[in-house]
């Protein structure tokens, strides 16, 4: 399920909750980065936890998405450490690329154009999972 990012979900996946998981668990996050404590995740990966991890979003990714950085050094410590693990893949916000998400973006874009023209408040796109 898609989990919204708020105070109740901040670091929902942490040392304590990871300890409850089987070592062979597969962890996938396509919701919000701050749901997973990256330091706890890295500690667990170092200890052999997780069969596989797929992160479309992660806390601290800020300047590492939507830009080709294939010819520069990774300066973000969390990104660099996450990429060390062969069982982990970073997908850089590709989960948004669904028909529903693109349709919601297109609808809100058109509504915003109309609202701007009429002097009304602008909205934002939200795709319900």
Task: Name each region found by the language model.
Residues 24, 31-129:
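Rossmann-like dinucleotide-binding domain for NAD(H)/NADP(H)
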Residues 1-12, 20, 29-32:
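Rossmann-like NAD(P)-binding element
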Residues 7-8, 13, 77, 92:
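Residue-level signal for pocket-adjacent positions within structured domains
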């Amino acid at each position: 399920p898609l989990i919204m990012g708020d105070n109740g979900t901040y670091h929902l996946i942490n040392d304590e909750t990871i300890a409850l998981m089987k070592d062979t668990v597969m962890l996938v996050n396509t919701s919000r980065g701050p749901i997973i404590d990256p330091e706890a995740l890295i500690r667990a990966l170092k200890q052999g936890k997780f069969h596989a991890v797929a992160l479309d979003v992660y806390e601290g990714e800020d300047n590492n998405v939507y830009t080709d950085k294939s010819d520069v050094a990774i300066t973000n410590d969390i990104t660099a450490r996450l990429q060390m693990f062969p069982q982990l893949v970073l997908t850089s916000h590709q989960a948004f690329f669904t028909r529903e998400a693109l349709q919601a973006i297109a609808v809100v874009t058109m509504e915003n154009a109309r609202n701007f023209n009429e002097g009304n408040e602008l909205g934002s796109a939200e795709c319900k999972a």
